[in-house]
């Protein structure tokens, strides 16, 4: 691992328990109502699947249940240990997104769920994904929508104007920051405009063949009624790409 990637992994090592408590085993409606069902749609029918940044393995287990042979890779021992305890079929390896411990051209599909927005630089990770994919293989990228990640962006409930709206910060420049996502939990986030992801992938032979921008999940809106008017603003983006070179 590079020094910077290692430092990013240390943050996830520290906060692995927080992630497991609040985002797995049915705790998070956005995973239950959107991410896991979209994984069913985009990853069904593949034989060998790699989950990059697998965490404690909930997506890997889901895809394994579809009949795939799944390998999950994560930089956090705490996440890998939890994934192995929870079982469900996949094989788990500790490793970096920028140095995947997987043979070249050995995967029919690769997925990365809410991972690349925490990796800087991310181009080496894309290089590795291209390396391990077989020709005509599929890469499915789940992202926090770039509109949400622009610095200074946020939901505004304007009591003076009587309006609710999304304030968009500087969208075009790349930006790296440490964000407090819960009390005492600070994690690295990298904002990049959508074009950066698409162009970096295209330059390496990964071409977008499908894109999803679902509205916020009903469970999320039910938990946060103050976001009621945000049902037309996506929180998640999914890009399915195909390796053509």
Walk through the language-model features, giving the residues of each:
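A short acidic, Gly/Pro-enriched loop at the edge of an enzyme's catalytic core
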Residues: 98-109
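A short glycine-rich, Lys/Arg-flanked "PGG" loop and its adjoining helix->strand segment in the class I
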Residues: 123-138
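A short SAM/SAH-binding and catalytic strip from SAM-dependent methyltransferases
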Residues: 109-122
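Short alpha-helix
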Residues: 175, 188-211
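Acceptor-substrate binding/catalytic loop of class I
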Residues: 147-151, 157, 181-195
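Class I SAM-dependent methyltransferase SAM/SAH-binding core
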Residues: 50-52, 56-99
